[in-house]
Every structure is written in structure tokens, then in C-alpha cells.
Amino acid sequence: MIHGIGTDIVQIERVQRSLDRHGARFAARILAASERDGFAASRDPARFLAKRFAAKEAFGKALGTGVAIPATLHAVAVDHDERGKPLYCYGTALAGFLAERGLSAHLSLTDEVDYVVAFALIEKR
């Protein structure tokens, strides 16, 4: 059964302006610890951050909490499986919260020249 859906769109140039203005502090606000190496290695840091931010916003909307405890920006991370499919990873507290409620999340990400779009679906098992 579907618990919730969420979507978010982010303009990459807006993220670039924030990166230009605030540098590493801006990235640190958005990224979970597990995402920092990927960011450092990225050829397009603004696009990398835009994807993560959109995915986390979409997750919070699907969960119904917004980006707030337990679904903070640092508690949700984006990774990929061996075939490149995006997936969510969670900090310990959020993983427990989801497990207690029998919830699992799915993520779709797409990007074009100027925008990134994320769609999240959370289902109750």
C-alpha cells in the first residue's frame, strides 16, 4: 500500500549560486557523511548537490514530515545500486523509524541542462 508520494524540482543554477556564495559550508548542510566523497569527486558539484537536495525534499514530502526529524538532510542519503538505479540510504534513527512502521522508499531522479527532478514513493509493507 502506498504511504505517500513526493516530488521536487531544483534549478541547478540556483544551487551553483549558493555554492559560489557559501562554498563547502553549503554542501555540508545538504550532504550526509556517506555522500561527501562522491561530492568531492564530482565533475559537476552543483548538479550533484541539486540531485541530493531534490531527492531528500521528495523523501520528506512522501514521508509526510518534510525535511525534519527524523528525515533530516543528514539522515537521508542517495546512493546507487550496481546497475545505477538511485536508492535511499538512512542513518540509524531514520532506518529504525521506517522499519518500525514497515515503510520502504523508492526514488526516481532525472536531470536536464537546467533542472533536476526527484520523485519518491514510500510504501507500507
Curated annotation (Swiss-Prot):
It is found in: Cytoplasm. Its EC number is 2.7.8.7. It catalyses: apo-[ACP] + CoA = holo-[ACP] + adenosine 3',5'-bisphosphate + H(+). Mg(2+) binds at D8, E57. Pfam families: ACPS (PF01648). Gene3D superfamilies: 4'-phosphopantetheinyl transferase domain. Belongs to the P-Pant transferase superfamily. AcpS family. This is Holo-[acyl-carrier-protein] synthase. It comes from Aromatoleum aromaticum (strain DSM 19018 / LMG 30748 / EbN1) (Azoarcus sp. (strain EbN1)).
